[in-house]
Curated annotation (Swiss-Prot):
GO CC annotations, alphabetized: cytoplasm
Catalyzed chemical reaction(s): ATP + H2O + a folded polypeptide = ADP + phosphate + an unfolded polypeptide
Organism per entry: Chlorobium phaeobacteroides (strain DSM 266 / SMG 266 / 2430)
Entries under InterPro entries matching the protein: Chaperonin_Cpn60_CS, Cpn60/GroEL, Cpn60/GroEL/TCP-1, GroEL-like_apical_dom_sf, GROEL-like_equatorial_sf, TCP-1-like_intermed_sf
Protein name, as recorded: Chaperonin GroEL
Subcellular location, record wording: Cytoplasm
NCBIfam families: GroEL, PRK00013.1, PRK12849.1, PRK12850.1, PRK12851.1
One Pfam family this sequence matches: Cpn60_TCP1
GN (gene name): groEL
Length: 547
């Protein structure tokens, strides 16, 4: 076992802080409309230029092990916020740094870390409640475009495209982002369906860069039971292999010998195949398999209906124009089902929605309806160079996530102002002792930090002056860093999804609290390599092998 180095107390916290600051300082320069770009070196190809906080955070690895632990903890804040809300990664990083910095001062002055944590937790709870109170729902195309524009670093073209896509396929419809062949960015709507099941083995991947299995003009086998025996699957596999078309297998599960055989044949190139689990559970799974079968013109091979897998022929298989499978989702585009059958199925689901008495059932039926009728909107992103293409595509993906978050939980005023307005929620936070009260005050101070940083990135205005003026204002009044004017930010289109702001604060407080209550850091001791090369065996030349 490798020997360990252990550092305690203030030494550990100070080193962790160095790591936190290194990562946060690199990330926070990207915040706001006046945020700068960060250039990231790549081992192969051109460097990447980005203004996306989580992309910067993911690239940072520090030489010192303890400092690196601090950096990785804050990286987790950015990563988790991106996963949950799709945006707000830089805000989350700025908040985490501020909470840890303020907390550390108080721990050094003798405050109990665990009480500080309790105070921080209570404060965050009240601020989140206040954010929900000041949140407003969005529905119109214009409001959706505003959110998309802000999240795409003030690119109105992207905001308009996302609003248009949501208008075409509905708020629950599927929107994917792809690289265009030319320089123009455009929206294309393709009929299709997506369900939340990914490939059963990464060996099915055909595009290693995106870790996706892409099947062009595939056949689709739909089975409602587990497949573990290769014998029952073999006849239909041989028939599909003879057709020369790729095959997607959707079943309850594929395991053991059957999965191993599929993987081996896929790697040898004898079969173009991918396997996924069936979506849903119980009766809902049966209904969703039937939806897929109707959309693709196939048949669910089910023993309940008298169909056996070993007797299946090509007529049982569904067909589609293209299928994309990643680790989490399967998207079926251009299903070859009969339009009249698809329409009848849609009407059947609409009838079930009207009769449903359960909110949960209604929600799930509406999801199925969206998958069958909404189709897939494809945003084809064009750019002059590959570097610009990657940067723009990342911004579009962020903006899309943020816009969905806005539709789910509503919007609040942007530009760091919502957190300033939510400070009044701290009046309701109850502290049992002085240290908990200090924890609440730490959050009060940290909530100002995103606005300070947005102003600092403009490079022309004094943050303290702006902060005071915004605090004295009310409602949507704030500082527009793009125009450097004080105005009604919502009317100016400066808004943030409530979910993004909430997730940023919750994740930042969670990680900063863990760092504050850390008393020891354990790392591997690096073995120092000797500069002297080992002496070759066999003695010295010309000495007859003698030493």
């Amino acid at each position: 076992m490798t020997a360990k180095d252990i550092i305690f107390d203030s030494d550990a916290r100070a080193k962790l802080k160095v790591g936190v600051d290194k990562l946060a300082n690199a990330v926070k320069v990207t915040l706001g409309p006046a945020g700068r770009n960060v250039l990231i070196d790549k081992k192969f190809g051109a460097p990447t230029s980005t203004k996306d906080g989580v992309t910067v955070a993911k690239e940072i690895e520090l030489a010192d092990a303890v400092e690196n632990m601090g950096a990785q903890m804050v990286r987790e804040v950015a990563s988790k916020t991106s996963d949950v809300a799709g945006d707000g990664t830089t805000t989350a990083t700025v908040l985490a740094q501020a909470i840890y910095r303020e907390g550390l001062k108080n721990v050094a002055a003798g405050a109990r870390p665990i009480d500080l944590k309790r105070g921080i937790d209570r404060a965050v709870k009240e601020v989140v409640l206040e954010l929900r109170n000041i949140s407003r729902s969005i529905s119109g195309k214009k409001e959706i475009a505003q959110v998309g524009t802000i999240s795409a670093n003030n690119d109105p073209e992207i905001g308009e495209l996302i609003a248009e896509a949501m208008d075409k396929v509905g708020k629950d419809g599927v929107i994917t982002v792809e690289e265009a062949k030319g320089m123009d960015t455009e929206l294309k709507v393709v009929e299709g369906m997506q369900f939340d099941r990914g490939y059963l083995s990464p060996y099915f991947v055909t595009n290693p860069e995106n870790m996706e299995a892409e099947l062009e003009d595939p056949l689709i086998l739909i089975h409602d039971k587990k497949i573990s025996n290769m014998k029952e699957l073999l006849p239909i596999l041989e028939k599909s292999a003879q057709s020369g078309r790729p095959l997607l297998i959707i079943s309850e599960d594929i395991e053991g010998e059957a999965l191993a055989t599929l993987v081996v044949n896929r790697l040898r190139g004898t079969l173009k195949v991918c396997a996924v689990k069936a979506p849903g559970f119980g009766d809902r799974r049966k209904a969703m398999l039937e939806d897929i079968a109707i959309l693709t013109g196939g048949t669910v091979i089910s023993e309940e209906k008298g169909y056996k897998l070993e007797n299946a022929t090509l007529t049982y298989l569904g067909q589609a124009g293209r299928i994309t499978v990643d680790k989490d989702n399967t998207t079926v585009v251009e299903g070859k089902g009969k339009p009249e059958e698809i329409k009848a199925r849609i009407n059947e689901i609409k009838g079930q929605i009207e009769k449903s008495t359960s909110d949960y059932d209604t929600e799930k039926l509406q999801e199925r309806l969206a998958k069958l009728s909404g189709g897939v909107a494809v945003l084809n992103i064009g750019a002059s160079t590959e570097v610009e293409m990657k940067e723009k595509k990342a911004r579009v993906e962020d903006a899309l996530h943020a816009t969905r978050a806005a539709v789910q939980e509503g919007i609040v005023v942007g530009g760091g102002v919502a957190l300033i307005r939510a400070i009044k929620g701290l009046d309701n936070a109850v502290a049992d002792n002085e240290d908990q009260k200090t924890g609440i005050e730490i959050i009060r101070r940290a909530l100002e930090e995103p606005l300070r940083q947005i102003v600092a990135n403009t490079g022309t205005t004094d943050g303290a002056v702006v902060l005071e003026k915004v605090k004295n204002g009310e409602g949507d009044f704030g500082f527009n860093a793009r125009t450097e004017q004080y105005e009604n930010l919502v009317e100016a289109g400066v808004v943030d999804p409530t979910k993004v702001t909430r997730s940023a604060l919750e994740n930042a407080a969670s990680v900063a609290s863990i760092l504050l209550t850390t008393e020891a850091a354990i790392t591997d001791i690096k073995e120092e390599k000797s500069d002297m090369p080992a002496m070759p065996p066999g003695g010295m030349g010309g000495m007859g092998g003698m030493y």
